[in-house]
Each structure stands twice: as structure tokens, then as C-alpha cells.
Amino acid sequence: MLINTEAVNEYLSFFMFIFFSLGLCFFMLCLSWILGGRSSSRYKNTPFESGIVSSGNTNLYFSVKFYLIAMFFVVFDVEALYLYAWSVSIKESGWIGFSEALMFGISLLLGLFYLVRIRALNWSSSVKNNIQLF
């Protein structure tokens, strides 16, 4: 049984890179723990905002709608990334790739219509929550 030395060398160099990278991270964490100070006081536990002493409560509470909009943005941003990757390789994918991208776009449009229908993108609180899904 012959062993391909080129493949072994490639894997060996990759695993050496991973080992030394993790070792360097571990070394820096241990060094900061050894050399770092361990004093704690009332002022060390207060938030620091560019040298300005904070006045009042520094905890900010956001509405859940902000997080919903952020999640919707991430979903449709990932869609744009997938469609960009498809558009780069459009010659290689042919009609099958086009039909897959079309089905992907249609499913995301249906998801967007669903979000509009359940009023997930509605910011006004005056509208009653009478949601009819079908």
C-alpha cells in the first residue's frame, strides 16, 4: 500500500497551521490572565462611554419590532447573496439552475407576502391584531 506523500504533506501543513493558531490563541489568553490585574472596584464595574460619566440608567430597551426587522433583513440579505452566487455561475448552471433560482425567488416572495399579510412589517400600533392567515 503506497501513501501519497504530497497529500500527507498538505494535510500535515494544514493541521500544523490549525495547531499553532489555536496554541497562539491559548498562549495569549493565558498570558493576559497571568499578567492582567485582578482588582475590582465600584468604578471598574460601571460602563464607560468615551470618557463621559453616564447619567441615569444605561440599559436601553428596544421594541421587539426592531429585532423582527433585523431578522427579516438577514433573511433577505442571504437571499441576495445566493442569487449573486447564482448569477456569477449562470453559464455553467443553465436552465436547471435558472429554474432552481426562480423557485427560490418565488418561495422568498411568498414569504414576503406572508409577512405583509400578517402585518409583521406594520409599525403603527393603531391597527388591531385581527390576523387572518387564509
Curated annotation (Swiss-Prot):
Keyword NAD on entry: yes
EC numbers for this chain: 7.1.1.-
GO cellular component entries: NADH dehydrogenase complex; plasma membrane
Keyword entries, A-Z: Cell membrane, Membrane, NAD, Quinone, Translocase, Transmembrane, Transmembrane helix, Transport, Ubiquinone
Transmembrane segments: 14-34, 66-86, 96-116
Subcellular location: Cell membrane
Pfam families in alphabetical order: Oxidored_q4 (PF00507)
Matches recorded under HAMAP family: NDH1_NuoA
Subunit annotation: NDH-1 is composed of 13 different subunits. Subunits NuoA, H, J, K, L, M, N constitute the membrane sector of the complex.
Entry similarity comment: Belongs to the complex I subunit 3 family.
Function per UniProt: NDH-1 shuttles electrons from NADH, via FMN and iron-sulfur (Fe-S) centers, to quinones in the respiratory chain. The immediate electron acceptor for the enzyme in this species is believed to be ubiquinone. Couples the redox reaction to proton translocation (for every two electrons transferred, four hydrogen ions are translocated across the cytoplasmic membrane), and thus conserves the redox energy in a proton gradient.
Protein name: NADH-quinone oxidoreductase subunit A
Source species of the chain: Buchnera aphidicola subsp. Acyrthosiphon pisum (strain APS)
Lineage: Bacteria, Pseudomonadati, Pseudomonadota, Gammaproteobacteria, Enterobacterales
